[in-house]
Amino acid sequence: MIIHPNFDPVAIHLGPLAVRWYGLMYLVGFILAIVVGRLRLKLPHVAAQGWSAKDIDDMMFYGVLGVVLGGRLGYVLFYKADYYFSHPLDIFRVWEGGMSFHGGFLGVTLAMALFAWQRKRHWLEVTDFVAPMVPTGLAAGRLGNFINGELWGRVTSPDAPWAMLFPGASRDDAAWLAAHQDIAAKWNLNEVFLAHQMLPRHPSQLYEIALEGIALFFVLWFFSRKPRPMGAISALFLIGYGAARFTVEFAREPDDFLGLLTFGLSMGQWLSLPMIVAGVLMMIWAYRRGGAAKAA
C-alpha cells in the first residue's frame, strides 16, 4: 500500500497571502490551455478560419468567468442545494472549496456562446476550437485534488498495488469499516485499520488525470488535426469526457451527503449520461450535415 504524502495545501506563503495548490493548479490549467490553443493556430485548416492569439486570450477571459461562476453555481445546485438555500451567503465562500465540473462546463458553454455572438462566429465553430484545450486544464485540476488529498476513491483491497491510504479520509474510513464488516473481513481491513487508522482506497484522482486529462487530450488532439464537420470535435469531447467520468465514478467515493442515487449510480454519473447522449446525437448531426468547410 502507498501512503498519500499529505501535502501542505498551501504552496507558497507571500506574507499574509497563502497561495494554495488548488488555486495554483487552476492557473497551470489555464496556461496549458493557452499553449494548446496557440499550437492549434499552426494547423493550416485552423489558421484558415482566421483565429488569432488575441482570440485565444479573449476566450480564456470568458472561460475563466465561466469556470468559476458555473463551477460554483453547479456545485450549489447539483450537490448541496438544501444547505446553500438555507445559508445563501456561504455561496460566496469559494475559498472553502466546492466546485462542480458539470456546472463549470455549462458556464463555459454559455461563455463561449457569448464570445461567438460578439465575434459573429457560429457557436459550434468556437467550441470546436476550444474543446482540445480543455483536457489539460482538467488534468491540472485533478492534480490539485490529489495534492489536497481530497475526492479520494472507494475502499479497495490492500493487496491492490495501487491501493493508497489517505490521511484525510480516516474519519470516513472508520464509518465505512463499521458499516461494511462483511467486506472488511474478506479483505482483512480491520487489521489494516488497526495498523494505520486508515483504509486502502483507489487514488481516483490519478485515474481521472489519466482518462479525463491525458487520454482525452490525445484523442481530441489527433482527431482535430484534420478538418472535421462543424460540431464533430465538440461532440467527441462530450462523448469522451462523459464516458471517462462515468467510468472513473465506479472507483470514486460518492459524496457523503448524497451517496449513490437511482440504480446505484452517483450524481457524477447521472450528470455524465446526458453528455454522452448529447455527444452521440451531435456527432450524427455533424456528419449528416456534412462538409468540413467550417471545421476546427
Curated annotation (Swiss-Prot):
Name of the protein: Phosphatidylglycerol--prolipoprotein diacylglyceryl transferase
One function term, GO molecular function aspect: phosphatidylglycerol-prolipoprotein diacylglyceryl transferase activity
Give the PROSITE patterns listed for this entry: LGT (PS01311)
Matches recorded under HAMAP family: Lgt
Q: Which GO terms describe its biological process?
A: lipoprotein biosynthetic process
**Source species, domain of life:** Bacteria
Which parts of the chain span the membrane according to its record?
17-37, 59-79, 97-117, 230-250, 265-285
- Give the protein family: Belongs to the Lgt family.
User: What is the membrane topology listed in the Swiss-Prot or TrEMBL record?
Assistant: Multi-pass membrane protein
Keywords on record: Cell inner membrane, Cell membrane, Membrane, Transferase, Transmembrane, Transmembrane helix
Location, primary (coarse class): membrane
Q: Which residues bind a 1,2-diacyl-sn-glycero-3-phospho-(1'-sn-glycerol)?
A: R142
User: What role does this protein play?
Assistant: Catalyzes the transfer of the diacylglyceryl group from phosphatidylglycerol to the sulfhydryl group of the N-terminal cysteine of a prolipoprotein, the first step in the formation of mature lipoproteins.
Q: Where does it reside? A: Cell inner membrane
